[in-house]
Regions:
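Short glycine/threonine/proline-enriched tight-turn/helix- or strand-capping micro-motif at secondary-structure
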Residues: 1-17, 40, 91
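Extracytoplasmic
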Residues: 2-4, 18, 31-33, 80-84
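Soluble periplasmic/extracytoplasmic beta-strand elements of cell-envelope proteins
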Residues: 4-6, 35-37, 47, 86-88
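Small beta-strand-rich domains/subdomains or short beta-sheet motifs embedded
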Residues: 8, 14-18, 48-49, 59-62
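A generic structural motif
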Residues: 11, 27-30, 52-55, 72, ...
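Hydrophobic beta-strand signal
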Residues: 16, 22-24, 63, 69-70
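Zn2+-dependent peptidoglycan hydrolase active-site motif and core
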Residues: 17-54
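Conserved, short, structured surface segments that act as functional micro-motifs
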Residues: 58-104
């Protein structure tokens, strides 16, 4: 299923952490391009998919608003000028609707 929201954005847009946290996974996947997972306090986890590059490493501490990745993964669905970034928010293993918590 689809557990997050898709955000249309220009290529090479910086992807920022939504809250302070620690990078717990960062790498390339064949289905989602470069993906970053950030563990936050109180058992929240944010996930950033369809990136063309990653700016942080596993174990790095990040602040809310800090750049963690860059959009623009070539998935065959994106035009050359724009792309899709997927954002997910999880709490204790349950997916949340990000738009209830964050204004995009």
């Amino acid at each position: 299923g689809h557990f997050g929201i898709d955000i249309q954005c220009p290529r090479n847009t910086a992807v920022s952490a939504v809250l302070d946290g620690t990078i717990v996974s960062a790498g390339y996947t064949i289905d989602y391009g470069y993906v970053v997972y950030i563990q936050h306090s109180n058992n929240y986890l944010s996930v950033y998919k369809y990136n063309s590059g990653i700016l942080k490493n596993i174990g790095d501490k990040v602040s809310g608003g800090e750049k963690t990745a860059v959009t623009g993964w070539e998935d065959g669905k994106s035009s050359k000028q724009s792309c899709v970034a997927e954002f997910q928010l999880w709490h204790m293993g349950q997916s949340l609707d990000p738009e209830k918590y964050i204004t995009f």
